[in-house]
Amino acid sequence: MLLVACLAAPSVLPAQVCLVSKGKAQARIVLAQDNDVNRKAAQLLQRFVRETSGGELPIVANGRRSKNCVVIGESTDEATDDGYVIDCSRGTLAIKTAGDKGAIYGVVALLEKQLGVDYLAKDFYTLTPSADVRIPQMHVAESPAFRFRQTFSYSNNDSTYRDWMRLQEHREMFAADMWVHTFDRLLPSSVYGKSHPEYYSFINGERRPGNHSQWCLTNPDIFEIVAHRIDSIFKANPDQNMISVSQNDGNDTYCQCPECRKVNEYEGSPAGCYVRFLNRLAERFPDKHFSTLAYLFTMHPPKHVKPLPNVNIMLCDIDTKREVPLTDNESGRDFLRALEGWAKISNNIFVWDYGINFDNVVAPFPNFHILKKNIQLFKRNHATMLFEQVNGTLGTDFAELRAYMLGKLMWNPELDADSLMQRFMRGYYGAAAPYLYRYQQMLTGALLASGTPLWIYDSPITHKNGMLNANLRKAYNELFDEAEKAVAADSAMLAHVRIARLPLRYSELEIARTESGGDKAAVEKSLDTFGTICALYGVPTLNERNNKVEDYCRLYRQRFLPNGTKNKAAGAKVIWNIPPQERYQPIADKALTDGLYGGTTFVESWVGWQGEDADFVLDMGEQKQVNKITTDFLHQLGQWILQPKSVAYYASDDAKNFRLLGTHEFPEDRDISVKFVPATVTLSAPVQARYIRVVVKTLGLCPSWHYGVGYPAWFFLDEVVVE
């Protein structure tokens, strides 16, 4: 979608090349070499000159160069790969390339800085119409700060946007799309697990083959199998020379056999085994490049072994908080120690940075103030490649703005972040921009004032007394009301504003379900509005596990709005036989019978046990008739939260002698979606009882297919309902 804008014109300098005069083309585009990149660059220039002025510049390959021609694709050594030179002098405009997509990126820079074109999101750009297009004398050379730049954004599906933001895709670089968590693709546990369990991690006293287990990297047999597999991959992908040989997803699942432990202790980090193994591959294939993760248990570098130059370290800051730059909180400083440690032994670092709330992607995540400082930090510490994993799907918190700012800052970390934000907002939100800018400033200030961390598994409920308190939400809504009024006559801008408001609407719904009383009719109306807007604009999901909006709205009505069910155990006293983990005990006495159901984030309302059974008794205060008992469980595989083996319900009159009412068995469930699982036992005939005992049998250890293979599984429950 095109938005015609009246933007501040670039400073006027003496014209050297006239491309268009009074809507008529005065120049032509000459390809120095006729290849795909140069031709795409030429077509991009041709398109936007035409849309700006009406003049159509012809494109010729290897044609005669004359006055007013635009030469695209000559080589230059004034920049590094992907870089470019724009030289306008002596009546000719030359856009030179330092390699790869340099010609395209040079054209983009020219269009932005001289013609006032801004490509802001998928199929959406702004430009300043002018019947005359003249390029002043200039000589500009630019190189990217990072040789690889990638971020998540639904806008990346638009190839013009992706080129405009100067972004790459990992599949362009990594052979066979082997770019992260590749162990099980290279040495499949489904093939080798049963016959060779010794290839896999030794955890808690035995070998644990599985698709999330790691390799026993001191086993001499593995290397040749993997090397042969890698050789075949490179032969099948002759145009690519990089591959990732990296741990499967999951924490602390590294091998702890005596030989691996000996290396880990000597190196001071499990990363020692990994770097040693990668170095052997790098020596076997000296003309290839090998990437491996420094992630979770391998984040900190080894003390002695150093990666060879063709070993790339993909360092991930997944465990850090996001409310301040990495230098300013303890989790960030721990990562910084790792980054500085790797920087001392390698100049080949790929940083994987996170700016996402995995559990609630449609929730406010005000991290814009830290983007520039963190990217500068990565650059100072030898990072040459950068991936920004952010909330990138449509409807997530200011996804378009975040992707725009990151694209610009990954190319040049010295740009002014606030200016980038305001430029984007003027183009993307039009007359609503001042209100949304004010909203972001207020939200960020409130976050910092609250002292509450911003986490990648966050919940709006965490911030309901801070940046999302009732008074602030009222002020935010007033700003959005004004923003919607300002663009009411522009359907495109109104859509942008309404989508930007979704995180605030979602937060209000999430907070409302944790509060007793209140206007439930108003909450239901808000839920209807949220669902309608999401459906209207095609918002696909609410979290990393792809839970759909329509399912959220349906479950919200079932769980959090009045449904006529009366819990006879409401407010019951809880007597613990096997209490939950200590961190959940402060809420446990009330959370199981307070009538407030937990949401999709385990950090609020849920009560958890890890690796052991649960056993507790509810004292209902008097004899009551019991017909049915239901307990609500959470299923969230990514957090090691699995369904237990079973739950059994017992009844008693005296809290001493209990009789079994029934048992609910849980089937294995590998579904990655976050969901709520009710465990119900319905009695064939009612019984009288004062006490209800609940006994949950743990699954024990996470199974071989799970991220936490070999470690104790969690289960979480919240509400026990007696009918």
List each model region and its residues.
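Bacterial Sec-dependent N-terminal signal peptides
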Residues: M1-C18
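Substrate-binding cleft/loops of secretory-pathway carbohydrate-active enzymes
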Residues: S291, Y295-D319, V362-N367, G395-A403
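Aromatic, loop-rich ligand-recognition surfaces of beta-strand-rich domains
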Residues: G598-G662, V677-E723
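Acidic, His- and aromatic-enriched active-site or binding-groove loops in soluble protein domains
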Residues: V263-L281, P309-D328, K408-L415
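Catalytic domains of carbohydrate-active enzymes that cleave complex glycans
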Residues: L409-K590
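Feature activates predominantly on carbohydrate-active enzymes
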Residues: Q26, D36, A41-L44, F48, ...
